[in-house]
Amino acid sequence: MSFFGLENSGNARDGPLDFEESYKGYGEHELEENDYLNDETFGDNVQVGTDFDFGNPHSSGSSGNAIGGNGVGATARSYVAATAEGISGPRTDGTAAAGPLDLKPMESLWSTAPPPAMAPSPQSTMAPAPAPQQMAPLQPILSMQDLERQQRQMQQQFMNFHAMGHPQGLPQGPPQQQFPMQPASGQPGPSQFAPPPPPPGVNVNMNQMPMGPVQVPVQASPSPIGMSNTPSPGPVVGATKMPLQSGRRSKRDLSPEEQRRLQIRHAKVEKILKYSGLMTPRDKDFITRYQLSQIVTEDPYNEDFYFQVYKIIQRGGITSESNKGLIARAYLEHSGHRLGGRYKRTDIALQRMQSQVEKAVTVAKERPSKLKDQQAAAGNSSQDNKQANTVLGKISSTLNSKNPRRQLQIPRQQPSDPDALKDVTDSLTNVDLASSGSSSTGSSAAAVASKQRRRSSYAFNNGNGATNLNKSGGKKFILELIETVYEEILDLEANLRNGQQTDSTAMWEALHIDDSSYDVNPFISMLSFDKGIKIMPRIFNFLDKQQKLKILQKIFNELSHLQIIILSSYKTTPKPTLTQLKKVDLFQMIILKIIVSFLSNNSNFIEIMGLLLQLIRNNNVSFLTTSKIGLNLITILISRAALIKQDSSRSNILSSPEISTWNEIYDKLFTSLESKIQLIFPPREYNDHIMRLQNDKFMDEAYIWQFLASLALSGKLNHQRIIIDEVRDEIFATINEAETLQKKEKELSVLPQRSQELDTELKSIIYNKEKLYQDLNLFLNVMGLVYRDGEISELK
């Protein structure tokens, strides 16, 4: 215990301690050979020497640097010797402290008089030190109880300040006195200064410690200013202390800039103390976890307890609403959170056009829930409706009775560059897009003209396709091309039967795929005739993959020029003839079958995106959707892309640029259809006219629901919400029609007289009713909904 001043050997002196006797200057030497003797240095009964040094400003080399790094001009002495030899009275030489190397500021440590007050160091304040004659008189000695009471008061006053770390070199002791730190070196901030408690055996008057503000140096220079065991040098008189008014007086000596910073610091402290303790750390942790949970949750509505209670209360009040009202309420309820089915949505391949959406819905029902995490990581949770930016994201402001709380959204960067789609096109390196922007790559003038014109304008100007034939060389020229192609096909088939080598170069040239001398490509006009349509399967038998891909690119590039598109659109042909309807069925049976077969067996994801991109950029998509053929072609592309994307996600083949490219192309497609989706449903007069021609009592609109299901299947939650909002009336119209057929079925089933005609009509009604429900549920199941027992509910 001799290190702390408690000498058990009884060697304490009775007289005052002479500093010159206690200091032998060992700190000035570079190598001190006795400090490593711990038994002699820290021993209990060993004679303690005076060679224990904490630093000496006069020493050179590392010792001097260490002292300089502390920023305090401490003098070299031995605390062990000082405490061991006893406490002496004040020195009587009367020399004042004249510089930082004067040893008289250390006089009080060996004196029996009270220690001097702690004075601010020259580095920590810009105010001059007060003169000795300005010191206040000594205060009466306080008892230990008074000191502890003052300490508790000070701790309560500054309990909300962040405490500094305990200074190294100071022993741990009783509760520390806390002082507000004044701004030093232009860095305001609350801190605490804890002076070391006196040793138990030393008669030191603790009341002489200043209780006012004490300026403590902070880190304001490259070398941190720390505190050491020795007090800072300064003009301090041994028996005097700095008055409380000195700190206030030093504030007046601060520069205006420092005073402004001091006021700002005080304002910050008051603001912090005003709300201090308002929330406990547990409360803050709960709020943080709740906010983060709203970001990553898969189903925020179903996981919200308050929304579940609200939903139960609202359902309890429904007693007198009609059946349709219940259906609408159920639909609106689920459209907020279950509509998108973004965690149940799946991307399934469709090998044939008629079965592609059915397969997708089947797999969507049976698909395991493990893909929820994958789609959550893909970030398919953004909404584009009314939103407000906040710290954590965007909060939806569309609140209603079925959306009682705000939904937190994560902001996403959307490309604002109008040429962003062009950059996406450049990424399709595996597709020859050079010829897709125009009718040919050989003529730049024709390419510019092709980009400027709207291809659908020809369709609106002439419904019978005569204009397109004239722009491709005339009807006679097109018929001659068809005959030439037939001759080449016959020669190739003859060579194939004879086992000879086949060369399809002449046939390829006869198709005029790369001919740029016409506004409308002659190959497109060849498909206006039944003979040209029927020869296509035989043509594909002698083409390689690149040639087949070029033909498909040409078809999708000039899709609006196809006469079959004009004939199958209710806008250009509101009252088609029976011959025209048969031609539409022929094209669908042959050409669509060829396209589906090629895309299913020989195409990749990049090529399908290229075809869809050409369709979007060179055609009026909203006009194509009014045509049965155009709607089926778009359905084939997006369904096949959904298949490849799904298969690739399992084997991790697709890269992030490819996924982002698909999202860009889909957004472009959806933008061209937005606010026009309801136009894909033909008017009632058009359907009645077709049913009269075909002598049917039921209009099959399965291709429309297949398109809607495929569009929703590949889209995100906000896309699906827009689709539902636009086709809501058609959904309820289909439900009403099915209910009407159900009532008619009940009426016929209760008739006592049964005949063969009655049974046939009853079977037809049952089939049509089930077909309506099947088509509607085909669309609803993609989004996790189902129409059953007179209401739209969640798909189990």
Swiss-Prot record:
Other noteworthy facts: Present with 656 molecules/cell in log phase SD medium.
Phosphoserine PTM positions: 456-457
UniProt key word Repressor: yes
Principal place of residence: cytoplasm
An MF annotation (GO) of this entry: RNA binding
GO CC, alphabetical: cytoplasm; cytoplasmic stress granule; cytosolic small ribosomal subunit; kinetochore; Lsm1-7-Pat1 complex; nucleus; P-body
UniProt function note: Activator of decapping that functions as a general and active mechanism of translational repression and required for P-body formation. First decay factor recruited to mRNA, at a time when the mRNA is still associated with translation factors. Subsequently, PAT1 recruits the hepta-heterodimer LSM1-LSM7 complex to P-bodies. In association with the LSM1-LSM7 complex, stabilizes the 3' terminus of mRNAs. This association is also required for mosaic virus genomic RNA translation.
Region (Disordered): 1-21, 164-200, 365-465
The protein, known as: Deadenylation-dependent mRNA-decapping factor PAT1
Biased composition (Low complexity): 165-192, 406-415, 434-450
Residue numbers of N-acetylserine PTMs: 2
Organism: Saccharomyces cerevisiae (strain ATCC 204508 / S288c) (Baker's yeast)
InterPro entries the UniProt entry points to: Pat1-like, PAT1_dom
Disruption phenotype: Increases the level of stress-responsive gene mRNA during osmotic stress.
GO BP: any one term: deadenylation-dependent decapping of nuclear-transcribed mRNA
UniProt remark on domains: The region at residues 254 to 422 is required for stimulation of decapping. The region at residues 422 to 763 is required for PAT1 and LSM1 to accumulate in P-bodies and responsible for translation repression and P-body assembly.
Record's keyword terms, sorted: Acetylation, Cell cycle, Cell division, Centromere, Chromosome, Cytoplasm, Kinetochore, mRNA processing, Nucleus, Phosphoprotein, Repressor, RNA-binding, Translation regulation
Subunit description: Associates with the 40S ribosomal subunit. Associates with the heptameric LSM1-LSM7 complex. Interacts directly with LSM2 and LSM3 within the LSM1-LSM7 complex. Interacts with DHH1, LSM1, LSM5, RPB4, RPB7 and with topoisomerase TOP2. Interacts with CDC33, PAB1, TIF4631 and TIF4632 in an RNA-dependent manner. Binds mRNAs.
Compartments reported by the entry: Cytoplasm; Nucleus; Cytoplasm, P-body; Chromosome, Centromere, Kinetochore
Keyword match Disulfide bond: no
Family: Belongs to the PAT1 family.
PANTHER family assigned: PROTEIN ASSOCIATED WITH TOPO II RELATED-1, ISOFORM A, TOPOISOMERASE II-ASSOCIATED PROTEIN PAT1
Segments traversing the membrane: none
Biased composition range(s): Polar residues: 377-402
